[in-house]
Amino acid sequence: GFNVIDNYTYCFLGDGCLMEGISHEVCSLAGTWKLNKLIVIYDDNGISIDGKVINWFSDNTRERFESYGWNVIGPVDGHDIDEMDRAIATAKQSQDKPTLIIARTVIGKGSPNRQGTSKVHGEALGEEELKLTREALGWKWDPFVIPQEIYDAMNAREKGEKLEAEYNEMWARYGQEYPQLCKELSRRLKGDLPEDFEAVMQQAIEKAAVAQETVATRKASQKALNAFASHLPELLGGSADLTGSNLTNWTGVEAMRPDTYLGRHINYGVREFGMSAIQNGIALYHGFVPFSATFLTFSDYSRNAIRMAALMKQRSIFVFTHDSIGLGEDGPTHQSVEHIPSLRLIPNLNVWRPCDTVEALVAWQSAIESRHTPSIIIGSRQNIEFIARDPQEVVRDAKEALKAGAYVMKESGKGADGVDCVLIATGSEVPLAVKAREALEEKGIGTRVVSMPCTELFDKLSSEEKRAILTDAPKVAIEASVTGLWYKYVKNGEVVGIDKFGESAPAGVLWEKFGFTVDRVVEAAMKAINH
């Protein structure tokens, strides 16, 4: 056979890492999945920044990992290269378990006055201690000088070149014997999309533009998945125990299980942070387009992983549903108000809040095509009315949304040159903006409605392009979230939003209570106009 992908994955961690909650989430899951090619080396030095960890970390690490279903080796001497080499060789023999190698070490080993203390953890040794350390280690060479014998012993270039040549020769033979498989694997490892992907998405958008269905945008997201997932074999999704609510599964998809890794949907269990971090690892490995899902309010648990995806410029896709007070009786613990604007503050992250199936398709297309920018796709629990208009107009709007993150959904009754007011909305508030426009038009106020599903793409436009969409007319932004960020778009205009936590009540009652009504939007528009 051709072992074109046969690597082990190595992870190095310390005492502090094992104190973090995420270590339980992911290590428990790795044991359940029987990931035998995962080898974790634990630097067990007993020291963290505050001192000896025995005062705040007294777990029996061996028993902990054995309870997860891991193979545990050690403790071994982490300073003994031969002993470590034997431990790794033993770990590679595991057939059905990941392996933890407990490597006992002395932090700062060789420093006469600081080894084994927290001082060497977060501080430089200093010139005097460096001098003493060199003497203790018998190191006679100047700083930054590597003796030739050590350089030669550590230089793996010749060995690496030989192994790479052997691998390239095997890859060439693989390509000759299995040309289609080789071509497909090469495409996926490069991160390129299938040649027909754009056409598939365009066809799905055109179909949705005709159907004009009124659905919850979590359902719209699932419809998008059903449209393209079979054409994107590298798509690998999952949910943190909310598959039936997030709607991350698609027709015909199989779940990944410990007895088969062929499934393309992962049941992560209630592990939001672990799920999001695993997804980043999958993205870094290449060959897959990973996405994960939970409720929007639980994005707080995933925030560090989201930030890291943005920092590392990875194509990670995060689906967050149940996005506002619109979810109703679950109350303020589950009703997001601050999450959307706070996620928009993360650099190099596209946050999509679509209002219908067409915008959901656009959001997915953008997320999948954004190779170096992670994306968030936000969905509602409740149905959102599709704003009826000519299908060709809808398709045109979709192209504009994909490029600009915003578009004119409804023009002023006085035409583009007669805009007296602009209503900007996202997601479930777009139909409210359209209804408010009708009321304003009856008052003789030419009102344009702009749907802005992705503010980040809009922010990248030139001043002229932004003005073409928003004009210089007074503006009102409408979104069921904290209002602050919207003032950069409305300037001295108005924002209809929520600057306090929600309450437990039916969604209809909450919309009325928090001022998401036509009368409130009209009032805000009149105030903006009369500033």
Q: What is each residue range found by the language model?
A:
Residues 14-16, 73-76, 118-119, 348-353:
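Flexible, glycine/proline-enriched loop segments at strand-loop-helix junctions
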Residues 14, 76, 239, 293-294, ...:
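Small/polar loops that bind or transfer phosphate-bearing groups
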Residues 16-22:
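Short acidic, Gly/Ser-rich segments with clustered Asp/Glu that frequently serve as metal-coordination loops
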Residues 1-8, 10, 23-145, 155-378, 383-385, 468-469, ...:
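Thiamine diphosphate
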Residues 138-139, 143-166:
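Non-catalytic, alpha-helical, charged scaffold/linker segments
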